[in-house]
Design a protein with these regions (language model features):
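Extracellular carbohydrate-recognition regions
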Residues: 23-62
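Extended extracellular/luminal ectodomain segments enriched in beta-structured repeat modules
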Residues: 105-114, 124, 181
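Bacterial N-terminal signal peptides that target proteins for export
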Residues: 1-9, 215
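Bacterial N-terminal signal peptides
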Residues: 10-17
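Conserved Ser/Thr-centered positions that define the repeating blades of beta-propeller domains
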Residues: 130-133
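A short, hydrophobic C-terminal helix/tail in secreted or cell-surface proteins
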Residues: 213-230
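Surface-exposed, low-complexity/disordered Ser/Thr/Gly/Pro/Asn-rich loops and linkers
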Residues: 54-106
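Terminal, low-complexity interaction segments
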Residues: 29-36, 122, 139-211
Length: 233
């Protein structure tokens, strides 16, 4: 295959990826833009903590991202996110504890969700994703079990950083049953009980209408540009 043909193929694939990204509408998204309180006596504790409404998207009114624990000793902090300034972290995990995103999808179809999640070395490694379309009265399972990778430490694929995005920590899931619903809940529920200090961290929780933008779409476009530059030379 000629260099020209290879460059042309890369450019076509990149253009397709960007076009797919552009066709997706962000209904609601949380990137955790505000630090949680710190210092002696100020760190949030208790059975629940919320970061409030989505800071991005077309349907943020009435939305909420929160964490719920069975132990009042749970603490909530905002360490570095996955390529963003902060993340939503908590410890003292018991089986059944969860993060959850609430929103309305009225007027939107082809719903899907993507999120970044990691843990400490002693944090819960297995979660499930369940969904409710009636405000929490009933739940259905979207992902029966998924593995959460450790951030940093021996054998870990990388450490979360506020300046570098690592797509290996990203997950996504289609949720067609959430189309055009007034009271949708996506719940990330722990399937394990861990040591008190074991933490789980979530970031970049995004609910889309339409295809989920590929994490590598922009990088691929950059590759296409570089290929074009080489061709002109």
């Amino acid at each position: 295959m000629s260099v020209l043909t290879k460059c042309s193929l890369v450019a076509v694939v990149a253009a397709t990826a960007v076009a797919t990204s552009a066709s997706a509408a962000l209904v609601a998204g949380w990137t955790i833009t505000t630090a949680f309180p710190t210092g002696a006596g100020n760190v949030p504790t208790g059975v629940t903590y919320t970061v409030g409404a989505a800071n991005e998207g077309l349907q943020t009114t009435g939305s909420e991202l929160r964490s719920v624990h069975s132990l009042a000793a749970a603490t909530y902090t905002s360490p570095a996110g996955n390529g963003s300034q902060y993340a939503f972290s908590s410890n003292n995990w018991s089986t059944g504890d969860f993060y959850e995103a609430r929103l309305s999808t009225l007027g939107y179809s082809d719903i899907s969700i993507s999120w970044d999640q990691t843990r400490s070395s002693t944090g819960p490694a297995t979660f499930e994703l369940v969904m409710s379309t009636d405000g929490g009265a009933n739940f259905t399972t979207l992902l029966a079990s998924y593995t959460v990778l450790q951030s940093g430490g021996g054998g870990a694929p990388g450490t979360w950083s506020s300046t570098t995005y690592n797509p290996i920590y990203s997950l996504n899931q289609a949720a067609a049953a959430a189309d055009n619903q007034a009271n949708v809940i996506f719940r990330f529920r722990s399937l394990a009980t861990t040591a008190a200090a074991g933490s789980s961290r979530i970031d970049n929780v995004m609910i889309y209408s339409g295809p989920v933008p590929a994490p590598g779409a922009i990088a691929l476009l950059g590759v296409a540009g570089l290929a074009g530059l080489r061709r002109r030379r």
